[in-house]
Amino acid sequence: MEQEQDTPWTQSTEHINIQKKGSGQQTQRLGRPNLTQLMDHYLRIMSQVDMHKQTVSWKQWLSLKNPTQGSLKTRVLKRWKSFNKQGWTD
């Protein structure tokens, strides 16, 4: 089997595990996270991003003063179109 080479991606995703020795000194051991850990981390981050977007959206919504049905419809359509252009790249 070929040995896996370090890339910027694998280097940036390495976890540092700190283990105590019997003498009380600490040593660091680098290890790559498995796929489950990476997916868990990704989902946690995306969930935080989604919550932030919802909060910003509601703040904008609440900041509208006496919105009419027409102005709300226009605003929602603009946001929907911009979201569709961006897709999953947010």
Curated annotation (Swiss-Prot):
Residues 65-87 are annotated as: Mitochondrial targeting sequence. It is found in: Host mitochondrion inner membrane; Host nucleus; Host cytoplasm, Host cytosol. The record marks 66 as: Low pathogenicity. Coiled coil: none annotated. InterPro entries: Flu_proapoptotic_PB1-F2. Its main location: host cell. One of its GO terms (biological process) is symbiont-mediated suppression of host cytoplasmic pattern recognition receptor signaling pathway via inhibition of MAVS activity. Belongs to the influenza viruses PB1-F2 family. This is Protein PB1-F2. It comes from Influenza A virus (strain A/Port Chalmers/1/1973 H3N2). The gene is PB1.
